[in-house]
């Protein structure tokens, strides 16, 4: 049975990406996904252009490019492990997170998450993400406590082999679905 609706972002995870080139052959590996608790919202816009070619007075041919996605992930707090492993902040000997200006590039990572569905959750993975440093903001407490959030600006580019994103479907096998957060799912190159 298929989902009719989706709602409720949850189970956000990230897995550091390592890209290696040996003898001209590029390979990709991922660390074990780690949870990022406290997901509030995600909004990712598709990146790419559609270019028409006109002939005979009509759009004769149209090309589309897939340049991945960009947008925001809002969460309660960015975990310390994500700040050190992905954003490359340093934890000093006294346990203080230190951000330095010489970090010009954050680590690439896979972003895994899911939306509830009326039948079954829909699980996603974006394979080549980068995140920019979050803004710092808060406000004073008034009559009631209103928790603040932190937002990561994300870019999910295609990997050099073209892989952008995967998601579970109506017929995803049980082992793949159940193991979604144990390892980063990589599609079989001989399929599809």
Label each region the model flagged:
Residues 16-17, 121, 155, 160:
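Short secondary-structure transition/capping segments
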Residues 2-83, 131-149:
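Solvent-exposed edge beta-strands and adjacent loop segments
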Residues 129-192:
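Mixed-charge, glycine-accented linear interaction segment located at domain edges/termini
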Residues 61-127:
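Structured, beta-strand-rich domain cores
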Residues 29-34, 123-129, 166-170:
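Short amphipathic beta-strand/extended segments with alternating polar/hydrophobic composition
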């Amino acid at each position: 049975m298929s989902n009719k609706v989706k709602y409720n972002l949850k189970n956000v995870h990230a897995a550091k990406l390592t890209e290696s080139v040996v003898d001209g052959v590029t390979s990709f590996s991922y660390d074990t996904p780690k949870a990022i608790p406290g997901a509030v919202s995600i909004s990712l816009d598709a990146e790419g252009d559609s270019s028409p070619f006109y002939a005979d007075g009509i759009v004769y041919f149209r090309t589309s490019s897939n340049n991945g996605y960009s947008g925001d992930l809002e969460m309660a707090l960015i975990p310390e492990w994500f700040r050190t492993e992905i954003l490359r902040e340093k934890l000093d000997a006294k346990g203080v997170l230190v951000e330095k200006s010489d970090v010009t590039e954050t680590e690439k990572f896979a972003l895994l998450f899911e939306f509830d569905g009326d039948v079954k959750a829909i699980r996603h993975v974006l394979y080549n993400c980068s995140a920019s440093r979050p803004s710092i903001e808060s406000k004073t407490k008034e009559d009631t406590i209103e928790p603040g959030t932190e937002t990561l600006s994300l870019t999910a580019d295609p990997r050099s082999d073209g892989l952008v994103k995967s998601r579970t479907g109506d017929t995803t096998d049980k082992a793949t679905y159940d193991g979604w957060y144990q390892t980063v799912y990589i599609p079989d190159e001989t399929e599809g």
